[in-house]
Amino acid sequence: MPSLRSILRKTLHRCVHRFGFRLVRTPPFERALRNWELDHQPFYFVQVGAHNGITSDPFHRFLIENLAWESILIEPQSPCVNTLHAIYADRENIRIEHAAIGSGSSKDALSSPASNTLTLYKVSDAAVGLPHWANQLASARREVIASHKDRIPDIERWIETQEVPCMGLAQIVSKHGFPRVDLLATDTEGFDFEIVKQIDDLPSLPQFVYYEHKHLSPQEYSESLRFLHERNYRTHQVNNGDTFAQLR
């Protein structure tokens, strides 16, 4: 016999379907963001490794829907930067930075020459016959790109290097005059903990941190969790590859 909860759920679904809608369970991380932004507008968002702003991007919908998000999208690959400019050309609240975030303290970068660069390992733009997601593969760590050999057997022949502008996280945040960062998101193919560690250099700790852990070693991932827990964050895995952290 169906439970009362099951009966109520089906009844509610039928009601909304009649009006052309459907009910979808919102992921916990999204509920946390939605609740926070109601009382914190503008909401300050920094995304490191924005790629093209669409593919596998959990925050694209937020940016499209919400004019209250003051955002900095940081991306080192030129073709992706061009795409970001095209998508958000009419959005003054969204800034695009053609740069990579280096390792080490952002405070050091504040006094470093603007000509600092980072060596980026990426799949060549001229590569043919590869999966559609291959152009997302760009990292400061060559071994992370090469590790996709199980799905792209000849990936070694397509790996190339590119020198890209390199800045510190705090340097970029300061450049755009953000008084704080509410959400820091990073997806940099294995370089993510190096970026997360730079939250100590920001004006205050971000309320939320969302980072890709899939390409971190078990030791690095453990260290990243300890780092966040020591700063009073609660953490949980969003899926098999990402972690969401929220200040207590």
Description of each model-found segment:
Residues 1-248:
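Phosphate/nucleotide-binding beta-alpha loop and adjacent structural elements of enzyme active sites
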